[in-house]
Amino acid sequence: MKLLVMLWVLAVLPCAADEAAIRAAVSKSLPLIERSSKIAIEERSNCFTCHHTGLPVMTFVTARERGFQIDAVNLQTQLDFTVQFLAKGRENYLQGKGQGGHAFTAGSALWTLKLGGRTADATTEAVTAYLIGHQKELHHWKPPSIRPPSEESPFSATFFALESLRSIPAATQRLADARRWLEQTPAQTTEDRVFRLWALHAAQSDSTTAARDLLQTQRDDGGWAQLENMASDAYATGTALVALFRTGSVKADDAAFQRGLSWLMQNQHADGSWHVVSRAKPFQKYFESGYPHGKDQFISITAACWATTALLLALPVVP
């Protein structure tokens, strides 16, 4: 009987993802993200976006830390573009108006610069002051529009704002208010659970229960789904894995993390991409960014950035 139990346990435990296979998956994905991020700046030179600027920067920085050769010129171009975008709106930030996307754009742009190692200046100080005052009565931040899955949750907007304000002395009360809101407000979707976990960690609050809630929604196939009635996809799986790892809720060799990695590698397309079907209603003019999957390319590159970053986190940092 004991032997049967041991065999059953061995059967259901995932094999550790092979480092060579992970590197191969990343090596196929990175060129697609790099190419598309370059094209997007040329096509939409007046607009910072998470899907073609912020998240690619996250991926490039993480890849560089793991010993991958990245296009350093493109990385600096993305960071310079973010600086210039915020600088164009500096007066609006000083007046409390912000830019399109409001707190979500402001917070994610500052997060992007932080990832890229850029230091504070007069423009970023204006943006942080805007975030401190914006939506203060809510005790959290929320996006101005509902564009699922990546721009619909108040938890994601709150996370990006907290990451930008956590070291700002003038934001102490705002951070305390947000911490209480996070502790008292339940998550409804995977996007909520992912960013509630990350935001609680950023707010230096206990995130143990939030991590458990996210882990409990992992599917039998190893992935996560955006909603209960949807199948597992690369966006939900990638965001969940990155948040769990970055908050210290799991280690790279934990079974849940390994199962998620396996799902990502099994569902990567032969060309190195991942395909996620868009749920957001288009409101901007369509343009071809060079990433596969046509009208689904914006959410697909978003998913690819999270998925690639999750795979990278399983690899050792190269000194």
Outline where the language-model segments fall.
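Bacterial N-terminal signal peptides
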Residues: 2-12
